[in-house]
Amino acid sequence: MINTESSFDSSALSGAGAMGLMQITKETFWWLLSKNGEDISVEKLYDPETNIKYGTYFLSILYEEYGSWDTVYAAYNAGRSRVNSWLSDNEITKNGKLVNIPYPETAQYVNRVSRNVTEYSKLLER
C-alpha cells in the first residue's frame, strides 16, 4: 500500500491534499480521529508512525465493512461512497465483488496494490 501510495516518501503531498506514507486526506484523518477520540494535529500525518497507525486503522475499518481486500483497495482509492454505489450496480458487481471497476485509475490501483501485496508476502516467506 505504502509503495503504491507514496513510494515510501513520508513527506509526500498529493494534488488532492493526501499526506504522508499512506496518503491520508485531512477529511479522512478527522473522521478517524472522531472515531477514536484522539486530538492530534493533521501535520502529524507526516510522521511515519502516526501515518501508518491511521492508515492501517482506516484499512481495518474498510475491511470490516467490505470483507474483500480488492474492495478495500478500491474504497481507499476512490472513496467509500463511490464504491458503495458501484456495489449496487449489477454491471460492476458480481456476487458482491467488484468485477468491472469503472474508473481506470482505481482499477489500476487495485491491481498494483494486489501485486505489491503478493510480492511482499513472498519476500516475507523467505
Go through each PLM region and give its residues.
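Catalytic glycan-binding domains that act on GlcNAc-containing polysaccharides
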Residues: 2-126
